[in-house]
C-alpha cells in the first residue's frame, strides 16, 4: 500500500469516526419546530416518512425504510405521507391514496417508483395514472372516481397542513 493510499485511508477513518461521534446541537444540526405535533400518551412513537414518488432519493431509500418498518415492534407506528407541494405532487399523492384505499398489494408502491425511475414514465397525467393502475386490474372508471374523491382530497389537505406544521420544504 502506497503512502498516499495509507494517508487517504487514515483521513477517511478519522473523518467518519469524528462524524459518527459528533453530538447533534440545537441550532446547528437541527431546530425545534414552532408547532410540534402532539405526542400520544400511550407510549407509541409515530414515525412519519414524507416522500414523493418522483424523488430519486425516496426511490433509493424505499427498500431500507420498508425493511426498517417491518422490524419495528408495536410501540412504533410507521406511516407514509406523500407531499403535495405542486400539481404533479398532488397527482402522485392521489395515486398513493388510491393504492391505499383499494388495498392493493404494498408492492404496488414499489412498482410506481420503478415505473418512474427505471422505465422513465413519470405518470404526469391522470390518463397515465389510469393506465398504470389498469396493470393492477383497476378499471379506469374506478381510478377516475378515486382521483376526484372527497376523502382523498381531505387526506391530501390534512397532509399539506401537517407538512407545513413540520416545516417540510
Language-model region placement:
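Extracytoplasmic thiol/disulfide redox context detector
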Residues: 2-87, 157-160, 164-167
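C-terminal cap of thioredoxin/glutaredoxin-like
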Residues: 3-5, 134-169
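Functionally constrained cores in energy, signaling, and assembly domains
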Residues: 8-9, 20, 47-50, 92, ...
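Short, exposed beta-strand "edge-strand" segments with a Pro/Gly-rich flavor and a Y/T-containing core
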Residues: 15-20, 120-124, 132-137
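General secondary-structure edge motif
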Residues: 30, 35-38, 79, 92, ...
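Structural alpha/beta surface segment adjacent to cysteine/selenocysteine redox centers
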Residues: 48, 53-132
Amino acid at each position: 500500500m502506497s503512502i498516499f493510499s495509507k494517508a487517504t485511508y487514515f483521513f477517511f477513518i478519522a473523518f467518519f469516526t469524528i462524524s459518527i461521534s459528533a453530538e447533534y446541537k440545537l441550532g446547528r444540526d437541527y431546530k425545534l419546530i414552532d408547532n410540534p405535533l402532539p405526542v400520544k400518551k400511550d407510549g407509541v412513537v409515530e414515525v412519519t416518512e414524507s416522500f414523493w414518488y418522483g424523488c430519486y432519493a425516496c426511490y433509493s431509500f424505499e427498500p431500507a425504510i420498508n425493511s426498517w418498518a417491518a422490524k419495528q415492534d408495536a410501540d412504533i407506528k410507521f406511516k407514509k405521507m406523500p407531499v403535495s407541494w405542486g400539481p404533479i405532487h398532488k397527482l402522485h399523492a392521489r395515486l398513493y391514496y388510491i393504492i391505499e384505499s383499494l388495498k392493493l398489494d404494498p408492492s404496488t408502491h414499489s412498482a410506481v417508483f420503478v415505473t418512474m425511475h427505471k422505465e422513465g414514465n413519470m405518470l404526469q397525467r391522470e390518463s397515465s395514472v389510469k393506465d398504470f393502475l389498469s396493470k393492477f386490474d383497476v378499471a379506469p372508471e374506478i381510478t377516475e372516481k378515486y382521483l376526484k374523491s372527497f376523502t382523498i382530497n381531505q387526506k391530501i389537505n390534512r397532509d399539506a397542513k401537517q407538512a407545513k406544521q413540520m416545516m417540510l420544504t
